[in-house]
Amino acid sequence: MVLSRLLRAGEGKLLKRLRRIAAHINELEDDVLALSDAELRAKTDEFKRRHTDGESLDELLPEAFAVAREGARRTLGQRHFDVQLMGGAALHLGQIAEMKTGEGKTLTCVLPAYLNAIAGRGVHVVTVNDYLAKRDADWMGRVHRFLGLEVGAIMADMTPEQRRHAYAADITYGTNNEFGFDYLRDNMAWSLADCVQRGHFFSIVDEVDSILIDEARTPLIISGPADQSSRWYQEFARLAPMLKKDQHYEVDERKRTVGVTEDGVTIIEDQLGIENLYEAANTPLVGYLNNALKAKELYKRDKDYIVRNGEVVIVDEFTGRILHGRRYNEGMHQAIEAKEGVEIKAENQTLATITLQNYFRLYEKLAGMTGTAETEAAEFNGTYKLGVVPIPTNRPMARADQPDLVYKSEVAKFEAVAEDIEEKHRKGQPVLVGTTSVERSEYLAKLLVKKGVPHNVLNAKYHQSEAAIIAEAGRKGAVTVATNMAGRGTDIVLGGNVDHLADAELRKRGLDPVDNREEYEAQWPAVVEKIKEQVEAEAEEVRELGGLYVLGTERHESRRIDNQLRGRSGRQGDPGESRFYLSLGDELMRRFNAAMVETVMTRLKVPDDVPIEHKMVTRAIRSAQTQVEQQNMEIRKNVLKYDEVMNQQRSVIYDERRRVLEGEDLQEQVRHMIRDVVTEYVNAATADGYAEDWDFEKLWSALKTLYPVSVSWEALVDSDEDLSKERLLEEVLADAEAAYAKREAEVDGKVGPGAMRELERRVVLSVLDRKWREHLYEMDYLKEGIGLRAMAQRDPLVEYRREGFDMFHAMLDALKEESVGFLFNVQVEAAEPEPAPEQPSVPVSVSRSAEPTPDLQAAAEAAAAQSQVRRAKPTSAGPALSQLPGSTTQAPSALRGKGLDAPEKQRLNYSGPTEQGGVQTTSESAGEQGNGTSTRRERRAAARAEAKKNKRR
């Protein structure tokens, strides 16, 4: 509470400043009104020129906002209110603008997006789902295109070429997951041409609380298949029903964890025929057991997932939508598949990962909008250094929030809900009902059918018509049953949403705001005017009936989600009403103090169908929600603390990759690598005693696997001068450097000038990627078991940092060692490549061999133990270029390796948060957009489609 007050200390001054900015913009309105369309459009070029000449965006703000407001008025027929000007200015200043539902956040976003696009560095507008990204890019994009800016949208099914084009636009709309995955894919790319993003300048996050708070518990992960037997999942799915809750294992529903008791462990050990489940060799079995029990107790069919066509399909617990192609992580999905007896699909290995917190902290400037941010102001400030500015409403709030009604049973609660809906419908008042699952929404729908109440159901099974249903949810007599967050981002306007109804009418006529822009814009005003008259007449009737009635059938674990549901009513000063119906069987009530309330109701002999309203119940609910919010915040803080370790390492690797991709000359870096590796070899061999104690044969055997050694150890020992460690190192280093100079002359002579520099680039990139993937796997494994350190009175986070640091440096040493070995030993030749019409040409190809050569095996062993030199006997020839790992490209005539084949594309999976914090995993087929490549034919088709689209514009 104290922190919240401190954070709001300067709020009044900032609001005064924002009001002054809005007043200044209003003073410019008459001048802007007098401009023709062409003159208004020319203002954009003028602003760009002035900014290039040194004028700051802050100085341009009043004029740019005035121009953008007029652009919106001419294209959309909507003029920004003063509070929207204030909200836009707050966003430009890098703040979170808290604007209530219906205050026009989407329109507000146009102002700072337009202003910051003038800098020419790209503005990213982040939304919660693909539908909203496309809608806003089409809808608000009309304003930007009218003013001469380009607008792009990132969709999940786009090719890399389409993504690159969208990012090249002045303003790009997309979801947080797509922006984050593109960043990760860019850092897996093999050439700059494969990268799609162009930096991180300014991001405006719509529904910022949802994206930066709720979804921040789940990191973004790109993974590929890992070898894993499905036998153990089936085995533990067989064993789980044998164990009884509270006897063999305990379940903590609040933390969503399970713990096996001694009796449970004994049963498992007997069934598996093992002596100790917790000994090191059996550690993986504990994970299978925990997942099997979680699948049994915490993941319910038709609530958390459904089984369709032999597949387990996740249902988003917050929106009720089916999440096709998405999978739970860490073996959880496989455990559920085993439980349901369907095909068990392979687990994955992490290839790249980042948390949303660290992704959004890449931006030079970050801002956000939401209707409910004040409760999380401290976290926004602590994690993102973002202040929260409550923007006043355009008109006073007139919604009546009724007290909660608590029933003893769920059946009685839903009967009361159905009766309330029937009563409101009979008088014509529109009703929006919020449920927590598909199952409950369908149960309520059946009750309404029995009562003869016509209604629309908005859940996972019917989400295709989501926008249309929500747009009409404010019409007279409308009854809409929706899962909690469905339709977020679409205003429920009394009488109907004019813009959506007009857009639907024009689309019925075959017109699209992008493909048929001119015809669409020409017909828009007349259609809007016609629909506006009809809507306004109906809206007046609805206002007299009391406005939109929002009815919640259960409290959410977060107060913000409850407030978001309530916020659908009472927009722009309209009347409205809200009420929550609860039962003692609700999940939140069960998790906290429901037994106490039930005891009171039983003592008072309260019938099942009679609700209670009491301060004690209200306090219990508020206390429960506060506890869950605190738990979730701790989880997010913990995720961030652990990812900070990875973030430092990721920055080093990604910066190095970028330098390699941008063509930095690696000659000096490679020379340092040679010196470091040779020095490590010599130091390891000469650590003890004097020259007569050193194992020269072992050292020379190792050095020969690294490079062609020309100096003899016998000659050094037999020389007149005493052989010291320093002299030995000096001689070997001189020999290695001479060998590398000879190697460079050989490669350049065989292929052409500069070939060695290109070989260095490809080898370093290849080894870097493979070592980073291996390191991610090791770090995942470390994190899984690090919690056990607490039992030894050690801080798991401190241990994770320390061991992660050691592992990272070991990985860098192994990277140097393998890179040097490849550069000396890889076979190259000059030859014309075979025609490859489906593959782009790039300077060098590097691909993974099916079986590692002895040299490669020895390199891997040496990397595993830094203190010892363990090298295999050298072969007569080094590995072919085709044996370098990680290639994704075809070699040109300049430089090729023997036996080079085009590598197969890897099937990737993308794991990230759902709209409200659940976990989703999307699978892609090999060769689809996610791997960052496309065939030449696909690129040509995409280019033709883009050219046609541009021509129509």
From Swiss-Prot:
Pfam family, one: SecA_DEAD
GO annotation terms (biological process): intracellular protein transmembrane transport; protein import; protein targeting; protein transport by the Sec complex
InterPro entries linked: Helicase_ATP-bd, Helicase_C-like, P-loop_NTPase, SecA, SecA_CS, SecA_DEAD, SecA_motor_DEAD, SecA_preprotein_X-link_dom
Residue spans of biased composition, Basic and acidic residues class: 898-907, 940-953
Enzyme class: translocase
Ranges where the record places region Disordered: 832-953
Catalytic activity: ATP + H2O + cellular proteinSide 1 = ADP + phosphate + cellular proteinSide 2
Binding site for ATP: Q84, G102, E103, G104, K105, T106, D491
PANTHER family noted in UniProt: CHLOROPLAST PROTEIN-TRANSPORTING ATPASE, SECA INNER MEMBRANE COMPONENT OF SEC PROTEIN SECRETION SYSTEM
Entry protein name: Protein translocase subunit SecA
Organism from which the protein derives: Saccharopolyspora erythraea (strain ATCC 11635 / DSM 40517 / JCM 4748 / NBRC 13426 / NCIMB 8594 / NRRL 2338)
Primary gene name: secA
